[in-house]
Structure formats: structure tokens, C-alpha cells
Amino acid sequence: DLITNSYTRGKPRHVTSWRNLRTRDVCKKSPGKCIHNGCFCEQDKPQGNCCDSGGCTVKWWCPGTKGD
């Protein structure tokens, strides 16, 4: 999907940037909301946020959405 890391032809694909996610309306405008992959969407969070270039870590998964 747009956010999680995946591999294409053996090369890792980078996590979609915050700006691109906002442009695509993937992230909610208000912080703390869950989006389709279960990450909390907060621009100002340190490492591990789905809308940051660092990607999304387990810490920010919303309950019950890890399988999405």
C-alpha cells in the first residue's frame, strides 16, 4: 500500500512521505486519527509514524488493524 515498506525487484521501496500522503488525502487532517493501514497519523510524532519518512512501527498501530 502507500505506507508500508515493500520490496520491488529486490529493492526496498521507501515509505511515502508526509507531504505526498497529505496531498493524496490518505492522512486525516487532524492528528491521532486512524487511517486504512492502522497507523496513527500525526505529523509531529518522532520515528515510527505512518505519515513520516521513518515509516510506521508497531508502536503506532491502532488495535485490530495490523492485518490490513
Curated annotation (Swiss-Prot):
Q: What about PTM? A: Contains 4 disulfide bonds.
- The name on file for this protein is Conotoxin Cal12.1p1
- Taxonomy-wise, where does this protein's organism fall, top ranks first? Eukaryota, Metazoa, Spiralia, Lophotrochozoa, Mollusca
Instruction: Please provide the record's free-text comment about the domains of this protein.
Output: The cysteine framework is XII (C-C-C-C-CC-C-C).
* Keyword set includes Nucleus: no
User: Could you tell me where this protein is found in the cell?
Assistant: Secreted
Q: Which residues form the propeptide?
A: 1-23
Q: Record the organism.
A: Californiconus californicus (California cone)
Q: Which domain of life is it from?
A: Eukaryota
